[in-house]
Amino acid sequence: NIACIPTKTLVHEAGIAALLYHDDYPKQANLYKQAIGRKNRLTSFLRNNNYERLSKRPNVTVYTGEGSFVSANIIKVALPEGDIELQGKEIFINTGSTPIIPAIDGIKESQKVYTSTTLLDLNVLPQHLIIVGGGYIGLEFASMYAEFGSKVTLLEGGNRFMPRNDQDIANSVKEV
């Protein structure tokens, strides 16, 4: 609940902000702050609702801990009360993904570098945002923040945007 649904919620809110207050940064920034608040409430609601619904099912046991593979079919889970081992023929990993931070000098020391996750926690709309990466996530964020009123610069290290997608589709998206 930190990526898809919250981002789509903000994309919708950005479209409204662009329609209502196009070229009025202070008003768009205020709508952005409100949208982040609504996104946070939605995320919290979904997380709590999903956890409650799952934990009440008789055939589901929820463990909150750190897991590691012992073998192909066994996972060790470190819990506050001690480690346990869980075994299964098939193991489904659903932890989300970790954003890639490129090897750029000074990037780790900067207090103004955000990932796709941490950017969504900002309560203040950036006046200018530089997005590194021209894949679908970078393009979605560029579009969203531009509609909220930020000046957006998009950088792609490869020879084209959306490098993992069909070139015809990528070219069509670039034209838009």
What function would you assign to each model-found segment?
Residues N1-L125, G158-M162, D168-N171, E175-V176:
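Glycine-rich flavin
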Residues N123-N165:
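Rossmann-like NAD(P)H-binding beta-loop-alpha module
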